[in-house]
């Protein structure tokens, strides 16, 4: 290869680089981006007033469960609880699935029993029994009521639907608990 051919190749490469450089400067001058003062996006989130003793679940219910249970329907609760059937069973002596069998859960100890179901450490650590109020908070926001629970369900936001499900769960027992009366 002689020097004339080499000069043509180097000239073409340098010319291409020069064209790219001029094009880049021109594009930046015409379309200069407006850089924000602080990089990223601000996401405005309302603070939840219920981040208290119960892990934020207290604010989930707008009405007391005692009042809601007065108008709750076991039949509607059975229909609404079908979505729970993907992970739970409801019949007496039924098998555990991803979640435990829920027959007779109202008034039972939290994180214990349930035919050998392996509860999460968070559920075992919470202790206590499943009261109507605790079930309401848990079904509204499982991870808010018991942070670290293995239950992946997001919760039931509608108060009346939760009350129906709780009334249904209460009916699943040989000795259902009396529904609490609404305090005035």
Swiss-Prot record:
Q: Which Pfam families match?
A: Cytochrom_C
Cytoplasmic compartment residues: 1-10
Residue numbers on the Periplasmic membrane side: 32-184
- Which top-level group of life is the source organism from? Bacteria
Instruction: Identify its membrane topology class.
Output: Single-pass type II membrane protein
Keyword match Electron transport: yes
A single GO cellular-component term from the record reads: plasma membrane
Gene Ontology MF terms in the entry: electron transfer activity; heme binding; metal ion binding
Q: What is this protein called?
A: Cytochrome c homolog
- Give the source lineage, highest ranks first: Bacteria, Pseudomonadati, Pseudomonadota, Alphaproteobacteria, Hyphomicrobiales
